[in-house]
Every structure is written in structure tokens, then in C-alpha cells.
Amino acid sequence: FFPNAPVRNEEMEDYIGLVNPKSSIAKRLVLEKNGIRSRYYALDKSGRVTHTNVEMAALAVRHLLAEAAMTPAEIDLLACGTASPEQLMPSHGVMVHGALGGDGGAEVVSFAGSCCTGMHALKYAWLSMRAGDAQRAVCVASERLSAWMQARYFEREAELIDQLMEKPILAFEK
């Protein structure tokens, strides 16, 4: 599941804004080197969040279950991974399980904290099936970083850098 329409490189700042109101100095170089041409934001152009991370994960699972002609109650194991949960507790996996209706006695596990959380979830699901602990495991990895990358969160830092450029002695003050 991808939220909204793809956002091209040229449109990024229409969604996340400008800092101090300047375009990013590193943007062109980073995008040129990483080869990414578009991405999906869970934001509209006004910066309003359109989907939570939990909603995106639950929608992805619902699409999978629809293709498999299954219901959430038929899942034995739900393994979720994210580096960008909306909250620490309850865990991301428990929140996704709840968004799916929380039916059945599915085991729910959450992996969080780094870029490899999706692989951890996949490995856990695979090993659980190999061990016979689960017959129908679903693994989902989701991220929603777009809301954290909005310009408004970087304005204060930009102001401090401007002050430092005007008065370099500030770097040595305690």
C-alpha cells in the first residue's frame, strides 16, 4: 500500500515546505546520487497527515488478505516492523492488529528502531512457520517519515545557524 499519488523530486518541498524559506542545499546532490525519482507522502500539500503508519500497515494487510480471500481472524501470526511508530505503547504491531479488528488469537510481534525491522519481522514469521508455531503468518513493514520531515521542525535550527553565521563567537559560548 502506498498513500496518495507519487511525489516527484521537483514537488517535495510543495509538501514538506522550505526551511527559512530556502530550498535545501543538499537536496539536488542527494537526489542525484540516490537515484530516487519519486516517493509517497502520507501528507497533502498543506502538510496535513492523510494516513497514520498504523493505517498504512493495516491497509496493506487488508489488501493482502483480500487477494488471499482471507479474513484477519484467520491470521495466526502478525509480525510488524517499523522505525517510525506513532507511539511506544501499545506497540505498533498491537495497534495494527487492533486496526484490523483484533479478531482471533493471533500472536502479534513488533520490531522497531532501525531500517532492518521489516527483515526482522519477515524472519520471525518465516521461522515461526518453519517451527510449526504458525500456519498463516503475515509480515508487514511500514514507515511514515514524511510528517517528521516537515520544514517547521527545522526552522529553529536554521535560525540558530543564521545567528552563528552573523556572529561566529556564539560557537564558543556556553
What are these model-derived regions, one by one?
Residues 33, 79, 139:
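Short glycine/serine/threonine-biased micro-segments
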Residues 76-84:
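Short glycine-rich or small-residue beta-strand-to-loop segments that form or flank ligand, phosphate
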Residues 1-76, 98-104, 168-173:
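Conserved "HGTGT" condensation-loop signature of ketosynthase/thiolase-family condensing enzymes
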Residues 21, 62, 66-72, 86-174:
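Acyl-thioester C-C bond-transforming condensing/cleaving domain
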